[in-house]
Amino acid sequence: MRAMNLTLLTDLYELTMMQGYFKNPTDQVVVFDMFYRRNPCDGGYAVMAGLEQVIEYIRDLHFAPDDIEYLKSLNMFDRDFLEYLRGFHFTGDVYAIPEGTVVFPREPLLKVVAPVMEAQLLETAILNIINHQSLIATKAARVVYAAQGDGVMEFGLRRAQAPDAGIYGARAAVIAGCIGTSNVLTGQMFDVPVKGTHAHSWIMSFPDEYTAFKTYANLYPDSCILLVDTYDVLKSGVPNAIRVFKEMKEKNPDFKGYGIRIDSGDLAYLSKKAYRMLDEAGFGDAVISASSDLDEYLIDSLKAQGAKINSWGVGTNLITAKDCPAFGGVYKLAAIKNSEDREFEPKIKLSENTEKVTNPGNKTIYRIYDKENGKIRADLICLADETFDESKDMIIFDPLETWKKTKIEGGSYVLRELLVPVFQKGECVYSSPSVMEIQKICRQEQETLWDETRRLVNPHEVYVDLSDKLYKIKSDLLEEMGTAALKYQ
């Protein structure tokens, strides 16, 4: 979970392919792209997350003696290959989109440029890390958006699929805008706020609800959120909470940070009734927090119903991304060159499914912003050595429906290159921001999205297009591959 050597966190076929390359020596340097094809949760975007853990993985990549012994026990790997693994370390380059950035289908979130054996080994761990955290960050961003500025707390540890999913899922949730997590270990590891109240068992362990509330308020006067649905929200919970608030206020006029949490029942109805009772008692500024199997759709519905809730604790549906439990990231070969070659040879993977045909070449991505309002107009995938003049018109092509072309007038847009260097010649050259710094980045990133892209249902799709040069290379390869295929029919 922590301080582990994750080198064997890989699929077996990565190692069998490595041995194949080892036994058939090659000096090939390759380019692999990590990207995804569809936005999770039927949304309009995703949030990049997990880069810090990828950096840690690559930086510590080595085969320990017990790793070598285990691989030897499989009776699949020759002695000379195992000896090679003893001295293995990463020597290549990695480029990535920074964490917290909003991203879209088909564009490389991460690019590896390295000797073929090294690049191949990285595949599984990179996908495991980025797929998980980007999924949870995306789900959390949707939940935070639905809350319309109210605080959202991540409460899902007990429902997460194992400790690591809880730890790093909470990290991703905070990146996406959650104000804190109930997960204390995540708080310690990443210096993020930890939040929580008390359970029904606290109430039940006392002779009566009032005594339980009073005891808790005396213990935590600056963070006194009382769970009011153990017995009856309106007949018992809220009246007892008001009684305690009055007593605390009499003792300390500066008493604040108080409120209630409702964990069951009709949240819209109960919150309205509870607010009226609190307001009439002089506590209209109380926090009214809700939990109970929330997700972005229920929060959006409660908002539409006028629920008097201003704080949300979201657990199962967030930490598991229950309605969209997988992020479909893939890792595909895009280009190859031998040591004597000056330029990469583009490679393309064909498929019966158009969306699975890859984009060839050593590429980068430019984000195209509207110069007036700062909103994203499109993303442009191009070759890594291409440059553009913002004063000139730009023609871009849809990678799937290539007859669709868009002209963006010169002077009306601003470009930003998304992929940044992370490793150069095996050395990390990137300084990871803190989680709370990434959260600020993510908040700013989401402001660059049009409202139509952020909406929860049937969002507008942001265009991810190809440059003229890349479009021509892809078209030529498709024609060449198609002609070659005809020879075998």
Per-range role (PLM):
Residues 26, 30-86:
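N-terminal, Lys/Arg-enriched amphipathic/low-complexity engagement segments
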Residues 69-70, 138-142, 156, 454-461:
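Short coil/turn segments at secondary-structure boundaries
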